Amino acid sequence: MNKLFSAGALLAALLAPAPAARAQAPATPAQPWGSWVILTAQLPGGAAHRWGGYVELQGRSQALARQFFYYEAKGGVSFDIDPSVTVLVGGGHYSTSDYRALDDGPLNTEKRLWEQLVLTQYAKRLKLEHRYRIEQRWFTFRDDSTAFRQRLRYRLNAFYPLNKKTITAGTLFLSAYDELFLNPRGPVFERNRVYGGVGYQLNKHFTAQLGYLYQANFNYSGTGQVVLQNTMAKNNLVLALTYKFARRSDAPGQELLPSQQD
């Protein structure tokens, strides 16, 4: 009972920013639920081999498992400075379309680079991950116009194993995060993502996660206004499947946090 209470308190604490985010501006009328499907292959770093990396494919839909309009393919190379500090350089290609007119081609495509720092904390069962990211983004629109933007991101991710003390083979766990997106050119507070879900690590290779993600995008209603007055928000069901490659030199039962790379 104490374990379940602690896990519930953890999820409640991390999901608490969601109402606050909604309160900053009136949200648009209720929209249908969307869905995200994320497929990831990862080679984790470690004590013996500090270099790692991953590749990922992702699709997003306007409705549950249909009306897909957004696709991305990305990857990165990571280096473990020590067991609790990891740096990564990544890049990807992103495509956004009108789900009602897919034959017309993408509304815009994006090429993105980013630099990332991840700090990990372990407090008995509870694991906390702080992720800091700087992004450079090059857009090409349907009319052949282009744009360049930058963005800063911070994500606090918490993990709590339910049936073991560590997240290893055969572990059922909870995961929750809140991520802020900041735009140096404004609006400064561009986006907020709040996620809560459950996952299961089948063995040293496969992990599956299913969760709820609330995403709110904030825009100024007029140039120079300080108060955010226009909000677009959406609920999403997220399915994430991860395959981790294992090295022969990896320690048996090594704990690797099941972080989503998005």
Feature locations, PLM:
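Outer-membrane beta-barrel "beta-signal"
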Residues: 117, 233-262
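Short loop/turn motifs that connect adjacent beta-strands in outer-membrane beta-barrel proteins
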Residues: 45-52, 84, 122-128, 162-172, ...
